[in-house]
């Protein structure tokens, strides 16, 4: 939107040409979404408090969480608005990859919105039935996966990139649809499961978005992708704008979500951000790297799966409570310390993921 305007104004003043550079636009998009989040934050918090849109606490959860019952939720709407506005302002809207991500981001945001809304109306922690949530997530993930496969099949956009191996890049064929589906849905639900402590989910999301921004920039640059022996994907460079918009909005949200949180993102935020990370990794062909960089999310998800399976088999629990961050809480680890430790782990995993681009 603003990029298009600047391109028109360059004939009047050559200085507007600076907005044609991806690096400049990525920095501006980060700042735009950051300051929008800071601007909306206090206003959204007051609005949510006024209409009693507050967090519903699980009665079987840690007792230390009971004080959070009056904390406003659905703050993810603030994140979505900031990200979408920044992306529409500073990206080339003719780039189809931008719209693929916005489709998933918005679609999963709507699912999360209705999930949060139902929790608030029913005044319990049970929102949409798991079956219906999964069905709608699947519809969005399958539809975008099929569309991308039909449009880009047998190109670099449908190859499987394996870290550490520069010569092994098989064409996935129809397996592309299945892999993309699991990555998008899995990433969305993994972030959702992790979002149980103040700032626990948003900071790893920011770190991973930074990692994906570097990956998108390299993948969309024919010289760097050739140097690093990764597939060149023509349109992926513009995804940097989405990544930096998520970074800015996430940091702005963290301003109010850090311990003790004044607002929670709710499912409207966690489902949409997780879905966005998933589709970006699919479009840049770095699904395996997302698994590495998102190790905190993976750990949280595996802990839930193991807890459920082990309980059904033996009637006993592996952890005091799942996801695993609740286990450490119940063992006496203070929430702020636990959050920062997970942040540190996430940061290290993102650095590890980025380093694999060179180690091939």
UniProtKB/Swiss-Prot annotation:
One of its GO terms (molecular function) is UDP-N-acetylmuramoyl-L-alanyl-D-glutamyl-meso-2,6-diaminopimelyl-D-alanyl-D-alanine:undecaprenyl-phosphate transferase activity. Its cofactor is Mg(2+). Pathway: Cell wall biogenesis; peptidoglycan biosynthesis. It is found in: Cell membrane. One of its GO terms (biological process) is regulation of cell shape. It is an enzyme of class 2 (transferase). Coiled coil: none annotated. The keyword Transmembrane helix applies. InterPro entries: Glycosyl_transferase_4, PNAcMuramoyl-5peptid_Trfase, PNAcMuramoyl-5peptid_Trfase_CS. HAMAP family: MraY. This is Phospho-N-acetylmuramoyl-pentapeptide-transferase. The gene is mraY.
């Amino acid at each position: 939107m603003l990029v298009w305007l600047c391109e028109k104004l360059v004939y009047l003043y050559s200085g507007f040409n600076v907005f044609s550079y991806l690096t400049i636009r990525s920095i501006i998009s980060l700042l735009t979404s950051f300051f929008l989040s800071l601007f909306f934050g206090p206003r959204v918090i007051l609005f949510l408090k006024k209409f009693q849109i507050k967090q519903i606490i699980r009665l079987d959860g840690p007792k230390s969480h009971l004080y959070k019952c009056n904390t406003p939720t659905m703050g993810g709407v603030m994140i979505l608005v900031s990200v979408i506005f920044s992306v529409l302002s500073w990206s080339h809207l003719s780039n189809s990859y931008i719209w693929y991500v916005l489709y998933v981001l918005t679609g999963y945001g709507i699912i999360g919105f209705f999930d949060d809304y139902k929790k608030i109306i029913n005044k319990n922690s049970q929102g949409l039935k798991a079956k219906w949530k999964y069905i709608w997530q699947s519809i969005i993930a399958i539809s975008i996966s099929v569309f991308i496969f039909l449009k880009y099949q047998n190109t670099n956009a449908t190859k499987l990139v394996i870290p550490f191996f520069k010569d092994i890049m098989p064409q996935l064929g129809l397996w592309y649809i299945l892999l993309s589906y699991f990555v998008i849905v899995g990433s969305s639900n993994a972030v959702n499961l992790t979002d149980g402590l103040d700032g626990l989910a948003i900071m790893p999301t920011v770190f991973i978005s930074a990692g994906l921004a570097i990956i998108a920039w390299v993948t969309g640059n024919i010289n760097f992708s050739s140097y690093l022996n990764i597939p060149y994907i023509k349109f992926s460079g513009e995804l940097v704008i989405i990544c930096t918009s998520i970074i800015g909005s996430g940091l702005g949200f963290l301003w109010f979500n850090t311990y003790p949180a004044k607002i929670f993102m709710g499912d409207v935020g966690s489902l949409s951000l997780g879905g966005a990370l998933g589709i970006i990794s699919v479009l840049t062909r770095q699904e395996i790297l997302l698994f590495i960089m998102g190790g905190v999310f993976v750990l949280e998800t595996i802990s839930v799966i193991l807890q459920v399976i082990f309980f059904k088999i033996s009637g006993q629990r592996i952890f005091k409570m799942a996801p695993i961050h609740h286990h450490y809480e119940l063992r006496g680890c203070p929430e702020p310390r636990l959050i920062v430790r997970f942040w540190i782990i996430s940061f290290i995993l993102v650095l590890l993921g980025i380093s694999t681009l060179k180690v091939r």
